[in-house]
A protein has these predicted regions:
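Sec-dependent N-terminal signal peptides of Gram-positive bacterial secreted proteins and lipoproteins
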Residues: 13-32
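N-terminal hydrophobic targeting/anchoring segments and the immediately downstream early-domain regions
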Residues: 34-165, 169, 486-489, 575, ...
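Preference for extracellular/luminal or secreted protein segments
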Residues: 37-82, 86, 352, 371-744, ...
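Second-shell residues forming the walls of enzyme active-site clefts
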Residues: 57, 77, 108-118, 123-124, ...
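Hydrophobic faces of well-ordered beta-strands that scaffold small-molecule active sites
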Residues: 63-70, 91-95, 147-155, 203-207, ...
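Short acidic, glycine-rich surface-loop motifs adjacent to enzyme active sites
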Residues: 84-111, 205, 296-331, 401, ...
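Active-site-adjacent structural elements in enzyme catalytic domains
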Residues: 103-157, 177-200, 204, 233, ...
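Surface-exposed loop and adjacent secondary-structure segments within mature catalytic domains
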Residues: 139-288, 294, 298-305, 312-318, ...
Length: 937
């Protein structure tokens, strides 16, 4: 009997030791769950990609490197695109309006979905039968690898949008940028991601993260509204938000490719027109052009805000290495320049994590003209090879990717693929480079597919999703109202120049730079910016059926072409009617699109202002800029009654212009996102600190320490401690928080002597620093951020050692800026006891599973150990009571019964595990007591 009792005691000691180990083991697994899931997801995609890569033939591997365009909407077995997909295993396609890939509205969205379905089905069908491997003449079964289906859809309708029917027409990037509201950028991105992915598109060439540092007023070649603006910080912020929105809207099913890396904002040529040369060094690029790309790669705050790829631009740099006489090749083709760029720390980390580099169109008119100025010797396959070896993973080959000796694009693509396949077999270094890129491509495709295997069903979205496409106009309307900007005059002067809006008796002449486009080659011409657009909006919103502020007989509309005919005295146009109506009008309203030397009629407004002042003298002359806001010079702007920036020509923005004209919407919400020399507006100066503000200073003490949100209180400090100080939000000239990185000087003074100055930079408009208390006495802390030189003063009395109480006084300078004033004084005595911080203990569904698992494990261990001594009945009782005890303990804290919160707070993160284990131990103890009582009776 004694032997049995000793064995039972040993069993009990063993059980106690195991119980102590359970929470430690369980906590280890629990604490790593979130990170492990994310890591396993990325790891799983790469593992599946590696496994698939090892099964591919050389032809299948090199085919994945190419994104091609194709003409038309057919994918039958007689078409070239069918052959490229089936027999040459290309990685993807790019859809373009210029390639006639879309159908006539209103079937555009449905036709696009159908086209993409046929493309992906063709890829799948090719994997259902054997093919002959050309090198070995052996049969093999091609793998089904979903195609990238890409598009460039930059907003504002054509030409920036490839699809401009059936989808929601979204604002231009500059229209979004003028709001300075990242949430709106995110909403626009969400709509774009949702609607494009519903069509089956899984690769977006955008957004543009170019910084329009110095706009070109003549409109000869800059990006205009195709960029968020001219401040690198704000371009990065809006880009991050837009990218996050696209990823959210597509539910992770769309790759976002930022362009035009490393930045096209300083160029004086459009990327599709000519290869531009910019005089900038790498150090200069780091400060301006590269900053937005940093923001969405290595410096992105989340996976949602991180782009999947960068589109490398055909842009050259003079003085890239500091030698002004040295000019790079186009960056997309220059291995040294591109390698230097992508090895900068933010990009290197992003590349290591799977970021993909995509070349700009290797068949573009601009690139062909650069590589082959004579037009006699364009070697497409060697161009593609050089672009790949320069560091691009995917090669975009457009419809003009045609060697001089080849008949068409198809022939050049096939010969290029043959070259790559042969070089893959012959050159181990090239083979390694191909495998590296293909692995990244396959990994991205697995992530987009969100599946461990590629299936046709997971590749093509359901057709019923199309019912939700094109129904998000409210987002564009909201952006239009938040973006509208009064460029000239000031708000004060506007009340004098235009004291009242038009009334029912006023004659109004609307003159519009109308634009048209075709969705496809056989589609009818569409007026995407019609000459009657603004007049129609005015009639709809303020005409006889909407309040009767205007009547149609007093409204007249003309185009810029007609105005140009008047200025040229063209005999084929009866310009006398327009001339007479202008002469009799009280209001002349211009709707200005982009100005370009390629389009003479776009310059009609400038000519009108210079040549016919007699027709607008003593009239209300208003210009709405539906594109970039900098096309008019100072002299031209001085002749206007009002000049507004609208930034987009889509209908929602036209409606907003009408509402502004009639005073329904104030043009006070948006701000110019680029510099405008015509009104002497410099964006960098405008986003610098407002000199009329008084910077607020606070003791930067965490709320949890004080137990109060009042930032002007501080705990006891003594000599040798650090004084934590922060500013309030520092505002720029437009009343918005200054960009991150704005320099703030914190100045520590004693009397009239400056003891120390510390330079810090802002984050979310706020700067922080600390000062070391080295001696007793009275010190004063101020802050300045040029040109804002005034702040309140923190006066702190440091007592001698041994007297811990510190009193400080905040001196507030008078200011007209509307700021929240801190409390004037604050004293923390030694006897004050701060209230306890709020508890961080909480439980959730994961805790329930952990508690149940721990209870079952403990019960099973106790059962096993008890039965090893032959006590099967007591083993069952002990195990069950341990499980019951653990679950009862969990239920006690889950129901928040008295004392449960304190039980969670004391152990911290291990609370649930320890309490559950303790409950199980109590249950086992109860069974042990029961057993002892039973044995003694």
């Amino acid at each position: 009997m004694r032997t049995i009792r000793n064995a039972i005691k040993r069993r009990h000691r063993l059980i106690v030791h195991l119980l102590l180990l359970v929470p430690v083991i369980a906590t280890t697994f629990r604490g790593s769950t979130g990170h492990a899931e994310s890591f396993q997801q990325n790891n799983s995609a790469e593992e599946h990609a590696q496994a698939l890569l090892e099964t591919l033939t050389p032809e299948e591997r090199v085919g994945q490197l190419f994104l091609v365009t194709f003409e038309g909407k057919d994918v039958n077995f007689e078409t070239q695109i069918y052959d490229l997909i089936t027999n040459h295993h290309i990685g993807g396609v790019i859809l373009e309006q210029n390639s006639d890939n879309f159908v006539v509205p209103p079937q555009t969205a449905n036709g696009t979905w159908q086209l993409i379905q046929e493309l992906q089905t063709t890829e799948w069908s090719a994997s259902q039968s054997n093919q002959i491997e050309p090198e070995t003449n052996e049969e093999f079964r091609p793998a089904f690898i979903p195609l990238f289906v890409g598009i460039s859809q930059d907003g504002n309708g054509p030409p920036a949008d490839q699809i401009f029917n059936n989808l929601t027409l979204l604002p231009s990037f500059m229209g979004i940028g003028a709001t300075f509201e990242t949430d709106l950028a995110r909403q626009v991105g969400t709509v774009a991601g949702s609607e494009l992915s519903a069509l089956g598109i899984n690769l977006l060439l955008g957004p543009s993260l170019d910084v329009l540092e110095t706009p070109i007023e003549e409109g000869t070649g800059d990006l205009g509204v195709r960029t968020f603006g001219g401040d690198p910080f704000w371009v990065g912020e809006m880009g991050r938000a837009y990218v996050s929105g696209v990823h959210e809207g597509s539910e992770g099913g769309m790759a976002v490719i930022a362009k035009h890396f490393p930045g096209h904002g300083s160029s004086d040529r459009l990327p599709e027109k000519e290869v531009a040369t910019v005089r900038k060094s790498l150090e200069q690029l780091k400060q301006i052009e590269l900053a937005p790309f940093y923001a969405v790669t290595g410096n992105a705050p989340s996976e949602l805000a991180t782009v999947d790829g960068l589109l490398t631009s055909h842009i050259r740099y003079q003085g890239f290495q500091g030698n002004i006489r040295e000019t790079t090749r186009p960056v997309s083709m220059d291995p040294q320049a591109l390698d230097q760029l992508i090895n900068l720390p933010p990009f290197a980390d992003w590349i290591e994590a799977g970021g993909i580099m995509i070349s700009e169109n290797l068949g573009s008119e601009a690139f062909r003209r650069f590589e082959d100025p004579s037009g006699l010797n364009f070697q497409a396959r060697f161009i593609a090879r050089d672009a790949f070896l320069a560091g691009n993973d995917l090669l975009f080959v457009g419809d003009e990717f045609i060697s001089t000796s080849d008949e068409d694009q198809y022939s050049s693509i096939v010969s290029t693929l043959d070259l790559f396949a042969q070089k893959y077999r012959d050159d181990p270094a090239f083979q390694e480079r191909v495998d590296e890129s293909v692995l990244k491509i396959l990994t991205l495709k697995y992530k987009l597919n969100n599946s461990t295997i590629f299936t046709l069903g997971s590749t093509i979205p359901p057709q019923e999703n199309l019912v939700d496409v094109g129904n998000s106009d409210q987002v564009s309307r909201q952006v239009s109202q938040e973006a509208v900007t009064l460029i000239s005059p000031s708000f004060t002067d506007l009340a004098e120049t235009i004291p009242v809006p038009p009334d029912i008796n006023d004659k109004i002449v609307f003159i519009t730079d109308e634009r048209s486009a075709q969705q496809c080659f056989t589609c009818p011409e569409q007026q995407v910016f019609p000459k009657s657009g603004l007049m129609d909006a005015v009639l709809r919103l303020y005409g006889p059926l909407a309040g009767g502020q205007v009547v149609q007989r007093n409204l007249f509309t003309y185009s810029f072409d007609q105005l140009l005919a008047l200025l040229n005295r063209a005999p084929e146009f009866d310009y006398t009617v327009l001339e007479s109506e202008l002469d009799q009008a009280q209001w002349i309203i211009f709707s200005l699109a982009n100005v370009s030397s390629d389009n003479p009629s776009s310059q009609a407004l400038s000519r009108f202002l210079a040549e016919r002042p007699d027709l607008f003298r003593q009239k209300n002359l208003v210009v709405f800029g539906f594109d970039a806001p900098y096309y008019l010079d100072a002299t031209e702007i001085s002749k206007l009654s009002a000049y507004y920036g609208i930034y987009s020509k889509i209908p929602q923005f036209v409606d907003t212009a009408a509402r502004v004209l009639f005073g329904e919407i104030p043009a006070t919400r948006g701000d110019l996102p680029v510099s405008v020399s015509g009104i002497n507006y410099d964006l960098i100066s405008a986003t610098s600190p407002d000199p009329d503000q008084t910077i607020e200073l606070f003791m930067d003490v965490p709320e949890a320490i004080l137990g109060t949100p009042d930032p002007t209180q501080m705990p006891e400090l003594t000599i040798g401690d650090l004084i934590p100080v922060r500013t309030g939000v520092i505002f720029d000239h437009n009343g918005r928080p200054v960009p991150d990185g704005t320099i703030v000087d914190f100045v520590l003074s004693a009397g009239l002597t400056e003891i120390a100055t510390q330079k810090e930079t802002t984050q979310d408009g706020i700067a922080r620093t600390t000062f070391l208390i080295e001696e007793s006495g009275t010190i004063v802390i101020n802050a300045r951020s040029d040109p804002a030189l005034e702040s309140n003063s923190l006066q702190i009395d440091i007592p001698p050692e041994g007297i811990p109480t510190i009193e400080f006084v905040i001196t507030q300078f008078p200011t007209e800026t509307a700021t929240q004033e801190p409390e004037p004084t604050g004293v923390i005595s030694q006897t004050e006891t701060p209230p306890p911080p709020p508890s961080a203990g909480s439980i959730n569904l994961i805790d329930w599973f952990v508690a149940a698992g721990v209870s079952i494990i403990v019960g099973a261990v106790i059962y096993w150990l008890t039965t090893t001594f032959g006590l099967i009945r007591w083993g069952v009782r002990s195990g069950l009571l341990a499980i019951i005890g653990g679950l009862l303990a969990y239920m006690y804290i889950a129901l928040q019964l008295p004392g449960s919160q304190q039980l969670l707070d004391v152990p911290g993160a291990w609370g649930v595990l320890l309490i559950t284990t303790l409950g199980a131990a109590i249950g086992w103890g109860a069974s042990y007591g029961w057993q002892r009582i039973a044995e003694s009776s």
